[in-house]
Structures are given as structure tokens and as C-alpha cells.
Swiss-Prot record:
GO terms for molecular function: 4-hydroxy-tetrahydrodipicolinate reductase; NAD binding; NADP binding; oxidoreductase activity, acting on CH or CH2 groups, NAD or NADP as acceptor. It catalyses: (S)-2,3,4,5-tetrahydrodipicolinate + NAD(+) + H2O = (2S,4S)-4-hydroxy-2,3,4,5-tetrahydrodipicolinate + NADH + H(+); (S)-2,3,4,5-tetrahydrodipicolinate + NADP(+) + H2O = (2S,4S)-4-hydroxy-2,3,4,5-tetrahydrodipicolinate + NADPH + H(+). Pathway: Amino-acid biosynthesis; L-lysine biosynthesis via DAP pathway; (S)-tetrahydrodipicolinate from L-aspartate: step 4/4. This is 4-hydroxy-tetrahydrodipicolinate reductase. GO terms for biological process: diaminopimelate biosynthetic process; lysine biosynthetic process via diaminopimelate. It comes from Chlorobium phaeobacteroides (strain DSM 266 / SMG 266 / 2430). Pfam families: DapB_C, DapB_N. Its main location: cytoplasm. The lineage of its organism: Bacteria, Pseudomonadati, Chlorobiota, Chlorobiia, Chlorobiales.
Amino acid sequence: MKVTLVGNGRMGQQVAEVISRSNDHEIAAVLDVDARITPEIFHGSDVIIDFTVRQAFMDNLPAMLASGVPVVVGTTGWDDAMEEVRRMVADARASLMYSANFSLGVNIFLRTLREAARLIAPFGQFDIALEEQHHTGKADFPSGTALRAAELVLEANGRKRTIVRQLSDNRKLAAEELQVASVRLGSVFGKHTAFIDSDADEILVAHTAKSRAGFAGGAVHAAEWLAGMHCEKPGFYTMDDFLNERLS
């Protein structure tokens, strides 16, 4: 599989390292975040992997979709444009897979959290809150993974209806509000924790990344899967689609 990497930051470099150790894949090109991108750049590639920033991703997306090459997107911070991106993918009859976090461990954590949120829903004595920790160089907060975790809690629980990213000094948190706290600390790769609390006990559902290798390896697995799906059924995919097929 020939891969073009868009973005040469920490994650792009980690993905390149994973690919360099593989006998089955190779890097076709590495494009800097500021590169002028046209559809022709991607000709000869089997898949594109994008780890850039919101503005670069949105600017480059039309050219990536027009290339006809399936696109794996790890760039976060564009959730408010999700419907627009889905429409662009459909209009181009393209294949795009997005995840705020491609780590298999994180996605297993998210599934576990969704089930825990569902199980506590009938029992009003349980409250739930989320916390994410990342290195001080991470610009967006809460993290894309934390926001996805919050969405899953809202979908599965029913008692929580809105997400609160920052607490105010002059009001209490309402019972239907789900707090998502963010910590930026040192060189933390990523830690996500769900706190489920009652008067009698506390349940923790957590995932801690030990390195970026899990994120990068998951992105390459996703690229392999998407390249195969592109031939069968173009569309907008997530890690849920990937896991559902692997578990079926």
C-alpha cells in the first residue's frame, strides 16, 4: 500500500515510522501542512493519511476528495463542520474515514464507556463526569476523543443532556449537565477517565496512552481497511464501522 502523508508533525512522523517498519507499505510522499495541494499530487497513492490542523484540512479536503484516493483523517477540531464534510464526501462519491483517535485501545474504552453509561441510566444515584489530560502543546480542548466520549454518554444515558466544558464561578452544575474537564500537563500523551460516582461507591473507566504508537498503528490499520472498502462501497466511515466489521 502506497501512502501519502499530509502533515509532518508529531503524529505524521509517528505514522511514517510505523510504515517504514512494514514490509507491505511504503510512503509515496510527505506533504507539509503549508503545501499547495492539488488532486494530481495523490496520483499513484493507494490512501491518504491526514494529520494536520483544522484550517489546513478544510482547505485541502476538496483536492483530496477529487483525487479519487481514499482519505484517513486524524485531524481534529472541525466537529462543527461534520455535516458539510459528510456532504462533500457523498457528492464526490469518495471514501473518508475519520476518528479523533485511531488507537484500538481508545476505541475499546469508548465502547466500554458507552455500555457503562447505559447500565447506570436507570439508577439515579449514579452521576458521571469526564476528564481528559494531554501535553501542553495540544491546542484544542476538550480533546476530540473526550468530546466523542461525551456524545456517547449523552446518547446512552438519557439523564445527561448537555456538555459543559468549563465551570462558572457563580452557578452549580445542573443534574442534566455532563462536565468534561481538560488538563494540559507536561508531556502527557493522552489520558481519558470517566468517573461514575454514588454515595456507596465509585467506578472508573479509563484509558492511558503510553506513547503515540497506538494512535499511529491504528491509523495504518484503518488505512488498510478503508483502501479495501473504497473498492466495494465508497462513503464516510468511522472506527465504529471498522470495529463492527472486525467483531462480526
